């Protein structure tokens, strides 16, 4: 099985700060997806782990994904933001891959167990964050903070 975070060699411009990691792992995160026809969907997620802050790799356990998963399989481009935009005003954009077995599923199981021991993930969505934008209101709203080439 190919490991997503091993696909991206070299230095990543998109690095997650300690504050970003804490926010992503401890807040409700909204994931935006779109079907191949461009029909949008937004869903709230809770079972999240940052796998590699230096390379911008994030895992989300698939516990109840329906439209979100269908969209990711059709169109892997996603956007994330936390419910706490006041303190952590960032939008993260990236590319997602889905795993139903292997190392990532095991990590998703650990994430679920820490949240709610009776949860059992169906799979794991692994996202390589490629862009980070400022969401704080003011003159820099929407400004690109970091982007991988």
UniProtKB/Swiss-Prot annotation:
Q: Which domain of life is it from?
A: Archaea
Pfam families found in the cross-reference section: PNPOx_N (PF01243)
Gene3D superfamilies in UniProt: Electron Transport, Fmn-binding Protein, Chain A (2.30.110.10)
Q: Which PANTHER family match?
A: 5'-PHOSPHATE OXIDASE PUTATIVE DOMAIN-CONTAINING PROTEIN-RELATED
Name of the molecule in the record: Uncharacterized protein MJ0282
